[in-house]
């Protein structure tokens, strides 16, 4: 079993890198890869950089150079469900772009022509993430839709527009759909697991800066718990 784990920022990968044994680091086109063993599991950790282009480029390099069995995207997100609070965990069932609009030609909002309207996460990975979350005391986890766009969601009008397009939306962030799109095209199983650093809206920028470290810690804890579950289940 070879795991690939992607985070956009240093804060989102630092804890996992510090836990890696036999870590070998490589930089390709600005993407930082760390290869080793994470709690006994062969793993490659990628710090991709922020945004969809960086995420897509990094994921492509990751899959082409390292050939992992599956991809986990970890990090922070902004919450959309009223029941969610900062620090809560969101596990993807589906992922969608919230800033793609080709509806003039009959496509669903968020759909890239020639590709699915939404990208479904691997069911076995989702189940492993849910079991892993249940082992973490004091953390709420939900499973559902995550949406991606190249903008930070602190504009209330934009928040309401996106909520109108995707009423069931759990969280928003800036890389997941790009990672999912590349994984789908490569035929590589994926799941997105994010911890909330903010609740999308006017004060989200302040909250993000204040709680990024907490969100990164919770998300990393879920990744490690998930790898433990998968090792036991012989994924």
Swiss-Prot record:
Substrate binds at residues 78, 153, 174-175. It catalyses: S-adenosyl-L-homocysteine + H2O = S-(5-deoxy-D-ribos-5-yl)-L-homocysteine + adenine; S-methyl-5'-thioadenosine + H2O = 5-(methylsulfanyl)-D-ribose + adenine; 5'-deoxyadenosine + H2O = 5-deoxy-D-ribose + adenine. The active site is at residues 12, 198. GO terms for biological process: L-methionine salvage from methylthioadenosine; L-methionine salvage from S-adenosylmethionine; nucleoside catabolic process. The keyword Transmembrane helix does not apply. Transmembrane segments: none annotated. Its EC number is 3.2.2.9. Keywords: Amino-acid biosynthesis, Hydrolase, Methionine biosynthesis. One of its GO terms (cellular component) is cytosol. The keyword Hydrolase applies. GO terms for molecular function: adenosylhomocysteine nucleosidase activity; methylthioadenosine nucleosidase activity. Belongs to the PNP/UDP phosphorylase family. MtnN subfamily. Catalyzes the irreversible cleavage of the glycosidic bond in both 5'-methylthioadenosine (MTA) and S-adenosylhomocysteine (SAH/AdoHcy) to adenine and the corresponding thioribose, 5'-methylthioribose and S-ribosylhomocysteine, respectively. Also cleaves 5'-deoxyadenosine, a toxic by-product of radical S-adenosylmethionine (SAM) enzymes, into 5-deoxyribose and adenine. This is 5'-methylthioadenosine/S-adenosylhomocysteine nucleosidase. It comes from Geobacillus kaustophilus (strain HTA426). The lineage of its organism: Bacteria, Bacillati, Bacillota, Bacilli, Bacillales.
